[in-house]
Amino acid sequence: MFDFNGTLPLMMFQFFLLVAVLNAVFFKPLTQAIDERDGFIRTNNTEARERLAKAKSLTEQYEQELAGTRKQSQQVLADAQAEAQKIAQTQITEAQKQVQAEVMKAQAELESQKQSAFSELEKQVDTLSQQILNKLLGSTLA
């Protein structure tokens, strides 16, 4: 079946030479390209994970800052509303005091005019009473 003659070692030599040539020409560059591609993918994957972690960290940080800013703006708004309410209450109180003072002044002026009018009327009543009395007594005396 098999002859073990000089062709067998020659065939083995050709086979090993073919394997060496294929290894040098085809398999090493292919393996090198696959290794480079694998390294590139691993590097990109690692960088992507790092970027994702950094993005998540920044997102959390910005959300915390946003929540803090919202609380701060709500506090500023509440303070402004309280201050506006306080100012409005102060102005209302001051206006009420001014109105009360005006009312008191008007009442005092009316009271003064009333007293003046009563005193004038009393003078006129006295004068008229005197005139009536003079006419009545003067006509009965005459």
UniProtKB/Swiss-Prot annotation:
Record function comment: F(1)F(0) ATP synthase produces ATP from ADP in the presence of a proton or sodium gradient. F-type ATPases consist of two structural domains, F(1) containing the extramembraneous catalytic core and F(0) containing the membrane proton channel, linked together by a central stalk and a peripheral stalk. During catalysis, ATP synthesis in the catalytic domain of F(1) is coupled via a rotary mechanism of the central stalk subunits to proton translocation.
Family to which the UniProt record says this protein belongs: Belongs to the ATPase B chain family.
Membrane topology: Single-pass membrane protein
GO cellular component: plasma membrane-derived thylakoid membrane; proton-transporting ATP synthase complex
TM helices/strands, residue ranges: 7-27
Name of the protein in question: ATP synthase subunit b'
Signal peptide: none
Keywords: ATP synthesis, CF(0), Hydrogen ion transport, Ion transport, Membrane, Thylakoid, Transmembrane, Transmembrane helix, Transport
Gene from which the chain derives: atpF2
Localization annotation: Cellular thylakoid membrane
Alphabetical list of InterPro entries matching this protein: ATP_synth_b, ATP_synth_b/b'su_bac/chlpt, ATP_synthase_B_chain
Source species: Acaryochloris marina (strain MBIC 11017)
One term of GO molecular function: proton-transporting ATP synthase activity, rotational mechanism
Major subcellular site: membrane
PANTHER family tied to this protein: ATP SYNTHASE SUBUNIT B', CHLOROPLASTIC
Assembly and binders: F-type ATPases have 2 components, F(1) - the catalytic core - and F(0) - the membrane proton channel. F(1) has five subunits: alpha(3), beta(3), gamma(1), delta(1), epsilon(1). F(0) has four main subunits: a(1), b(1), b'(1) and c(10-14). The alpha and beta chains form an alternating ring which encloses part of the gamma chain. F(1) is attached to F(0) by a central stalk formed by the gamma and epsilon chains, while a peripheral stalk is formed by the delta, b and b' chains.
